[in-house]
Swiss-Prot record:
GO CC annotations, alphabetized: virion component
Organism from which the protein derives: African swine fever virus (isolate Tick/Malawi/Lil 20-1/1983) (ASFV)
Keywords: Late protein, Virion
Protein name, entry field: Uncharacterized protein K421R
Family that this chain belongs to: Belongs to the asfivirus K421R family.
């Protein structure tokens, strides 16, 4: 006769024992890596940062360094010297992109990915980055990306079908990171200070520009004037509109300028770098409406994300028009990008952005606490629901390598080899 057997439980228990045995084998390697990160104040990113926050074991360390070439070589040498006759004999440092990205393998296993911090490091304010958590392995406080930046990374992957196998795990990470972000956000809000942001006026003119912005299916609405409810989107003359474009950002600048000039609308357009360390290619186009009293009103923020990646969308029909809107995870991602930018502005200019930041954080909470729409609305399965341009990550790496000198792998056990 058949009896009930807890197959899953037995498998999990067996796997846990195997994983712990494997981890014990490389304990010195993992400890050395964490000590190095702590001593050199490197900043964990990606899944390493998520696991650090959850106080779970880390098997692959991804982190930023302010001297990535020298740090990668020094860490590889440290790991090799742990047991050069046996376990760490085959330690190799691989240059993915010179002075930007390095990988360290030990015993034919990848343990470390080091990235160069973008040149904007000096602009990153203390309240946002770095954040620190206690390691479950060494009990040291290690630096990692703040929860808002980790959430931006998570939402980016939840919008990318290439990471479909990771989605269940990413959803768990998202829930925990969102809780932390909302808990510690009021403390950040108190650090902005200054005067209140002025209210926007001239609603009919602004609405004309807004409707033009959403009239083409080359742009995706992700926030601002649109209410955060998939079933009741309404154009609102309140705060700014957020868009994603699939065109080159400077091409968009010319198109918008031409439209406003032909309609006698006085605007000012700026293209800037949001200084997002996890997405250095991101650029933001900002449109200001100029009033006759020489006051400027910020009405549109447009991001170039669609020019280098695919963005999942839903189509919305209103009395005014039909337009594309990003899925909830796309909306959440760019609400956090907007909050990041506003906090940078507050940090660098001492301008009070509390009111507008609170508006965006309320939208974020409303969006994430609303009943989830259908699975198809969250994770579109049709290729027609994705807008933008797909760029193969491997092609990007090869393109970056071609621009720079190719450096062969560095073996710590062979000091006469060419240095990285």
């Amino acid at each position: 006769m058949y009896t009930h057997v807890d197959v899953v439980g037995i498998a999990e228990a067996s796997a846990a024992l195997y994983v712990q045995k494997d981890r014990d084998r490389y304990l010195d390697v993992l400890t050395t890596i964490e000590n190095f990160i702590y001593q050199h104040k490197c900043i964990l990113t990606g899944e390493s940062a998520h696991l650090l926050f959850l106080k779970k074991s880390i098997y692959l360390y991804e982190f930023y360094s302010d001297n990535v070439a020298e740090h990668s070589k020094a860490l590889a040498t440290l790991l090799y010297n742990l047991d050069p006759e046996y376990l760490t004999r085959y330690t190799v440092l691989i240059t993915k992109i010179p002075n930007h990205w390095y990988v360290i393998n030990v015993d034919q296993r990848e343990f470390v990915r080091l990235y160069a911090i973008p040149a904007v490091k000096q602009h990153l304010p203390i309240p946002i980055l770095p954040f620190h958590c206690t390691s479950a392995l060494t009990q040291q406080d290690l630096f990692c990306l703040g929860p808002e930046l980790q959430l931006i990374q998570i939402y980016s992957k939840l919008c990318n079908p290439n990471f479909v196998e990771e989605w269940p795990t990413l959803l768990d990470y998202e829930k925990n990171m969102r809780t932390l972000f909302l808990e510690q956000f009021p403390e950040k809000l108190e650090k902005t200070g200054g005067k209140k942001e002025k209210e926007e006026k001239h609603e009919s003119i602004i609405k004309k520009i807004i409707l033009e912005m959403v009239s083409t299916h080359q742009r995706i609405v992700v926030g601002g004037y649109i209410q955060k409810n998939l079933y009741n989107h309404v154009i609102k003359n309140r705060n700014r509109l957020q868009l994603i474009t699939s065109l080159n950002i400077y091409e968009e600048k010319d198109i918008i300028q031409q439209f406003c000039d032909s309609n006698g609308l006085k605007i000012k357009i700026c293209v800037n770098n949001p200084l997002l360390p996890t997405n250095p290619e991101l650029r933001r186009l900002t449109i200001y409406f100029n009033n006759n009293d020489d006051q400027s009103y910020l009405i549109v923020d447009m991001y170039n994300t669609g020019s280098y990646e695919l963005v999942p969308t839903n189509q919305i029909n209103t009395l005014d028009n039909s337009f594309l809107i990003g899925t909830p995870f796309v909306q959440a991602r760019f609400l956090l990008v907007e909050i990041w930018v506003l906090m940078l502005i507050a940090q660098q200019t001492k301008k009070d952005t509390k009111k507008i930041i609170q508006f965006f954080i309320n939208q974020y909470e409303t969006l994430m606490n609303s009943p989830w729409p259908s699975i198809e609305a969250l994770f579109p399965s049709s290729s027609k629901r994705y807008l933008g341009n797909y760029v193969d990550p491997n092609a990007l790496i090869k393109w970056a390598q071609l621009k720079l000198k190719r450096i062969p792998p560095f073996y710590p056990g062979r000091p006469d080899e060419e240095s990285c």
